[in-house]
Amino acid sequence: MKTFVAKPETVKRDWYVVDAEGKTLGRIATEIALRLRGKHKVEYTPHVDTGDYIIVINAEKVTVTGNKFKNKVYYSHSGFPGGLKSTTFDKLQAAKPEMIIEKAVKGMLPRGPLGRAMYRKLKVYTGTEHNHAAQQPQVLDI
């Protein structure tokens, strides 16, 4: 019996909507990363992007446990000497709530061209509105 290898042109990709309201950040991010990679599919192949498209709504209502709301720190660097910037979870949630889910999921994806292709299939929105009604996304309960 031969080993099945998925081909990029034959992979069927579905669209899913995930409501992040009241969900824990890490638990929702792991499931999203798993589906972006395609590991939930039978035809999963490590070197082929077999994942689905994921739309996340209500990104501003995601929660964290414990003291992480005040203590979790996100870092970024401008590339210049002394250019390290840091912000806490609550400040980032007030300013850019989409970035919280994006950073959590991106850290769970592989580094390199394949990981970047998987990351591009993630769409995160604040509120309940999104621009992908034409794709007829299915609701995904996590």
From Swiss-Prot:
Q: What keywords does the record list, in alphabetical order?
A: Ribonucleoprotein, Ribosomal protein
User: Among the entry's GO cellular component annotations, what is one?
Assistant: cytosolic large ribosomal subunit
One BP term from GO: translation
Q: Which domain of life is it from?
A: Bacteria
Keyword Isomerase carried by entry: no
Q: How does it assemble?
A: Part of the 50S ribosomal subunit.
Please name the PANTHER family in this protein's record: LARGE RIBOSOMAL SUBUNIT PROTEIN UL13M, RIBOSOMAL PROTEIN L13
Function as written in the Swiss-Prot or TrEMBL entry: This protein is one of the early assembly proteins of the 50S ribosomal subunit, although it is not seen to bind rRNA by itself. It is important during the early stages of 50S assembly.
Name of the protein this chain belongs to: Large ribosomal subunit protein uL13
Protein's organism: Pseudoalteromonas translucida (strain TAC 125)
